[in-house]
A protein has these predicted regions:
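Catalytic domains that recognize anionic headgroups
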Residues: 1-363
Length: 363
């Protein structure tokens, strides 16, 4: 993504950021609330949830600072009834396929910024076209014309967009769609640079999760291809650097509030301000977890030199609770070798057990 790199290399690009969840509904709730999945419990795929009223949302924090707040969205997993309209002065929602595709939303964003140019404004824009690959939808003609027949070959969409097996074809479609995205976003980047100085803006770009069809068949469900995400910032008070600090997506709210000079109540959230953005210390690990009714709970702790997994064998119920049954704690170093250090594994077993204690069904 040359346009994206050229734009954000003048800010901070974070290369070790991990999503708290592996799919959109809980992941976007984390970005807006600063809570991890077990904190906000918006995890159920068929029962709607709502952002907890006990914590301010990012939009509410920014609204309280005096900004005109807006949301342009085509993603049905972060709609107003889920609490994402809290703090919004203007909320524009359209089903992605009916008017909120990338090429439309980017122009909508420019139009919005122009319309409210005399105000201090905050704009959240969601572009979800990459989801079309997992969902099996037709891609833009501009993408299709760059794909071979082999890369366009029909494949089963899978049980859900989350539970995707590795696919070479989908991987190629993913890469070509990202290249198309970068071309489109270049229009927005150019507009911003022509109209604003860096001390007048704070721009962030992030992804909610990775992709299952990028995970090799011999790797864990929560491997980095599914959990590591794009995460970058540019503008006022943003240093120019590449950061390899371990960061959780729960840290997004603290980062944005720091850049906007807003005080955060850290006692109520899981997010922390990374050292790269002025925090006091680095995270030693970031946890991603998968919790679905009818599925087995699993989690991974990603650290600098290793990744450690927790796999439970009992199924999760409709309330997000489960019995502990034949669970395993194991991990791998960066070079792929097994972790045999019992003290290290015991340490993370305790960390995982403390996290899930309130969700375990005890005899």
């Amino acid at each position: 993504m040359p346009n994206t790199y050229d734009f954000f290399k003048k800010g901070t690009i974070c290369t070790n950021t991990f999503s708290c969840s592996e799919w959109t509904f809980p992941s976007l709730a984390t970005y807006e609330s600063g809570l991890d999945t077990l904190g906000h419990m918006m995890f159920h795929n068929t029962i709607d949830g709502e952002l907890p009223q006990s914590v301010p949302t990012l939009t509410e924090y920014i609204k309280g600072k005096g900004y005109f707040t807006s949301k342009l969205d085509g993603d049905w997993r972060c709609i107003y009834s889920y609490g994402f309209a809290r703090g919004c002065d203007q909320y524009v929602y359209q089903i992605q396929s009916m008017g909120a595709r990338a090429e439309q939303e980017i122009i909508n964003a420019i139009e919005h910024i122009e319309a409210f140019k005399d105000t201090d404004q905050y704009l959240w824009m969601t572009v979800g076209d990459l989801h079309d690959i997992a969902d099996g939808y037709d891609l833009s003609l501009a993408v299709q014309k760059n794909l071979t027949l082999d890369e366009l070959e029909y494949e089963d969409a899978g049980k859900t967009s989350v539970k995707q097996n590795y696919s070479w074809g989908k991987s190629q479609r993913y890469k070509k769609t990202i290249q198309y995205f970068d071309m489109l976003f270049g229009i927005l980047y150019n507009y911003i640079e022509r109209n604003y100085k860096d001390n007048e803006i704070v721009i962030s770009l992030f992804a909610d999760h990775g992709q299952g069809y990028l995970v090799p068949n011999d790797k864990h469900f929560l491997s980095k291809e599914r959990t590591k995400v794009a995460f970058m910032f540019r503008g006022s008070n943003v240093d120019e650097k590449i950061s390899d600090e371990i960061i959780s997506t729960a840290d997004y709210l603290p980062i944005m509030c720091k850049l906007c000079d807003i005080q955060v109540d850290y006692e109520k959230i899981n997010g922390r301000l990374p050292l790269s953005f002025g925090g006091e210390k680095e995270r030693k690990y970031a946890i991603t977890e998968s919790i679905h009714p009818g599925d087995k709970y699993c989690a991974v702790a990603n650290a600098d030199d290793y990744e450690i997994y927790f796999d439970n064998q009992a199924l999760t119920d409709e309330e997000g609770r489960f019995e502990l049954k034949d669970y395993k704690v194991y991990g791998y170093y960066k070079d792929g070798t097994n972790i045999e250090d019992k003290a290290l594994l015991d340490k993370y077993e305790k960390i995982f057990m403390e996290r899930i204690a309130e969700h375990v069904i005890y005899d």
